Amino acid sequence: MTKWFNVGKIVNTHGVKGEIRVISRTDFPEERYKVGNTLYIWDEKGTDYLTVKVTSHRQHKTFDLLTLEGYNNVDEVEKLKGSLIKVPEEQLGELAEGEYYYHEIIGCNVVTEEGEALGTIKEILSPGANDVWVIKRPKGQDLLIPYIDDVVLQVNIENKLVTIHVMEGLL
């Protein structure tokens, strides 16, 4: 059975020539949405998908704008709004050491270098220079941890465990 990974969500159309506006859920939009790449657009129920090829990609504000082969006007892409864009596991490329896919990080437990459990990574934000990991704590508000070398000391994907250094003001 194929394992699928969410790489974006179609939130709207853009213009009249069939562009779709995508909120990306991938660290590598320039690779993922490269012209000629195959993507799979899943219906909102998650039961069926369309196979499409990317014919153009550009970034606009915080969105990725795509056009797809065979979809040439706004009426043809209107029905895709709300759909998820997914790729099968075999389309995931190898990463360099110290790089991780979102699905590998989300769900990891986070502990301090002293061994104190802080919570579980529930989301990854990409606001600018570096990613920010959102940690759901057992009690209280979520904790935001910057993904920088000074803070994230060790990531153990096999054991789903991240060890961090608590800098002053972080907690």
From Swiss-Prot:
InterPro entries: PRC-brl_dom, PRC_barrel-like_sf, RimM, RimM_N, RimM_N_sf, Transl_B-barrel_sf. Pfam families: PRC (PF05239), RimM (PF01782). One of its GO terms (molecular function) is ribosome binding. Its main location: cytoplasm. GO terms for biological process: ribosomal small subunit biogenesis; rRNA processing. Residues 96-170 form the PRC barrel domain. GO terms for cellular component: cytoplasm; ribosome. Keywords: Chaperone, Cytoplasm, Ribosome biogenesis, rRNA processing. It is found in: Cytoplasm. Belongs to the RimM family. An accessory protein needed during the final step in the assembly of 30S ribosomal subunit, possibly for assembly of the head region. Essential for efficient processing of 16S rRNA. May be needed both before and after RbfA during the maturation of 16S rRNA. It has affinity for free ribosomal 30S subunits but not for 70S ribosomes. HAMAP family: Ribosome_mat_RimM (MF_00014). Binds ribosomal protein uS19. NCBIfam families: 16S_RimM (TIGR02273). The PRC barrel domain binds ribosomal protein uS19. This is Ribosome maturation factor RimM. It comes from Bacillus mycoides (strain KBAB4).
